[in-house]
Amino acid sequence: MEKPNFTGLSHVCIFVDDVKDAFAYYERILGAVPNQHIPHWKNVGFFQAGGFIEEAKEAEVSIGFMDVPGTKFTIELMCYHKPEGRKEPIVFKANDISGARHVALKVTNIEEAFEYIKAQPDVTLINTTDDYKVYQISKTEPSEFYYFDEAKENDAQAKQAAADILGNTKYFYFIDKYGLQWEFEQGHTDIGD
C-alpha cells in the first residue's frame, strides 16, 4: 500500500450560514477575493463523498471559493441547506483539544493588521482585555528545539538562525463570526510557503 502523493494544500473549508454574506465578510477582514460560487448545488456524488449517502438525492449546498492575495491560500465557504446542521458556531479555548485550532496567515504589517482587526465589529480577539496586543516571541535558544533531520540538527549555525527567526516573530489571534480562530504572524519566515 502506497502513502498519499501530495502536491499541495487545496483549501480550508469554513462552514457558514450564508455564502454571499461570508464573501463580503472575508473580503472585508482579510481582503480575500471571491473566485467561484456554486449556489444551491444538488450533486449526489458530492454528498455521498461527504458521508451523506442516504440523504444525497435530497441534499443541497452552496459553496464559494475565495483567494487570499499574496498567498497560495484558498478559502472554501460552505452552507448546507439540506440536511441542516447546527446553526451556532462552537468557540473553543486556545488550549482545548478539538482538531485544527487555527489558520495562520503571514503579514508584513502586524501592528496595522492588529488595529484593523481590532476595529472590526464581528471579530473577537483571543483575549478581550486591554492588555492584549501584538506580542513578540521571547528569545529562543537552539537548545529549546530539535530537528528530526540529523544534518539540520547538527548544523549549529542553521539552528541559531532558526532560533533567531522564532525569537523575532510577532503575532496575535482572533476568532471570526463563524468560530474560526485566525493567527496573523510576522517574521516566521522559515515555515509555510
What are these model-derived regions, one by one?
Residues 15-72, 112, 119, 132, ...:
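Core segments of cupin and vicinal oxygen chelate
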Residues 11, 100-102:
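Eukaryotic phosphotyrosine signaling hubs
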Residues 41-52, 84-93, 144-163:
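A cross-kingdom feature marking solvent-exposed beta-strand/loop segments within repeated
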Residues 42, 82, 188-191:
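A short acidic/small-residue loop/turn micro-motif
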Residues 94, 98-100:
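Short, ordered secondary-structure scaffold segments
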Residues 7, 61, 98, 167-169:
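Loop/turn position at the start of each blade in beta-propeller repeats
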Residues 1-5, 14, 37, 75, ...:
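Vicinal oxygen chelate
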Residues 77-79:
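Active-site-proximal beta-strand elements of phosphoester/diester hydrolases
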